[in-house]
């Protein structure tokens, strides 16, 4: 429990978190958002795990498991985990 609270605290303090920590927060029910190249992206959970770009109808991605979500989410066909060092403003979703 303390680990998740430490991560939540890091996000509130606007500290960087790793891709694995980002996925861990999502796995534990947190809706997240971030910016990549001035574009806003978010994640949520309805019927599995969803990833989307804000205010865009295309490009919505949905996966049944957190493992599939973690491995496959992408921006412009590039895996998010490979782009993570360029992600900015990681926060909880609005």
Segments and roles (model prediction):
Residues 1-33:
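Negatively charged, low-complexity tracts enriched in Asp/Glu with abundant Ser/Thr
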Residues 3-11, 64-94:
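Mixed-charge, Lys/Arg-enriched low-complexity segments
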Residues 27-30, 34-35, 39-74, 81:
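Acidic, low-complexity, intrinsically disordered interaction modules
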